Each structure stands twice: as C-alpha cells, then as structure tokens.
Amino acid sequence: MTSTQRFVALVLLALSAGLQAHAGTKALLRFDGGIGTDPLTASNGIDVLNVVRGVNPAGRAWRVDKLRASIGKNGSISARGNGLLLASGDVIGTRAGITQVLATLACGPANNATLFHSAPAAFDTAGNFHIVGTLTQDGVNAAVLPPVCDSPVLLIRTVGAGGAPGTWLAAGIPDDTQD
C-alpha cells in the first residue's frame, strides 16, 4: 500500500468515526419557537401565578423573537434565543439587568415532572443567548435522560444565587416535525 493510499484510508476511517459519533447524539427533542411568560393566568375567573412544572414565572411579561433548541439522547443541549425582553413595565424592551439564563427540560406530567438543567449562559442586552452543554439534575453530573420524554416542556430561566435555577422567562414550542 502506498503512502497516498494509507492517507486516504486514514481519512476515510476518521470520517467514518466522526459520522458514528454524530449518530450517537441524535436529538431526543427539538423546540422551534418560543412563548414569553405572562406571570398571571386566569383560573375559574381568578388570576393566579402562571406556574409551569413547579417553576414560578418572572414578575413581568416577557416576549421572545426566536427560540430554537435541540436536546440529545445523551443529555446534550444546544439552545439559542434572540430578543428575549421585557414586554411590560417601566423598563420594557430591556433584559431588566439579568446577565445569565439557563434552560430547564421537564419530562413527565405536570404534577410529577422530572427537571433537568443546563449550566448558566451569557444573556446580552439585546436579549440574546446561546446555551451549549450537558443537562444535569444535581449541577455536577451529566443527567441520564429517559428514552422518551413525555409531555416535554423547555423553560428558559433566570439564574439565582450560586447558579441555582430561578423564575421562567420563556418556554420552547416542541417541534413535532423531527425525524
């Protein structure tokens, strides 16, 4: 075998390994589009907090231009949002001083959902963010996601003291067109 043939064989082997690695990160879930939080919702004619999967809403209404996210079967997450800004109050159209956000994936029914969180990511003054990493339940170890995430909800949240998940600002819209 010539050196050129060996080189071509190595390149093909490397490409094959890369494709296999990519196949292992196939998406479990995708989200395309987002809904900003409205802190109050009507229940039997009475305003109540708009709590989603046990997570309280931010104190004001928020809106989001664009939100896309992909969650891998291995717990990887990539989420990108644009224009997540306040939709009410004296500081309307701003990020209200928030400098970091994180994502929370909820799997299961509303009264018994399992929550998985991303690490905090930068949140710029235009309301843009890009979350990349691995979901966790304890803030340290990679989460083991269920093979199927029933009733999935993706929340973009504030970051509290010590990096703890805070209130929710926006929710992702599940993309049912995934393969």
Could you tell me what each predicted segment is?
Residues 1-8:
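Bacterial N-terminal signal peptides that target proteins for export
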Residues 9-17:
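Bacterial N-terminal signal peptides
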Residues 22-73, 176-179:
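N-terminal segment immediately downstream of the Sec signal-peptide cleavage site
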Residues 72-76, 108-111:
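A short, structured loop/turn motif at beta-sheet edges
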Residues 77-85:
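Short, well-ordered beta-strand segments enriched in hydrophobic/aromatic residues
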Residues 85-91:
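Extended, low-complexity, turn-rich repeat/linker tracts enriched in Gly/Pro/Ser/Thr and Asp/Glu
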Residues 92-101:
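Short coil-to-beta strand junction motifs in C2/discoidin
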Residues 111-179:
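Helix-rich interaction surfaces within compact, conserved domain-sized segments
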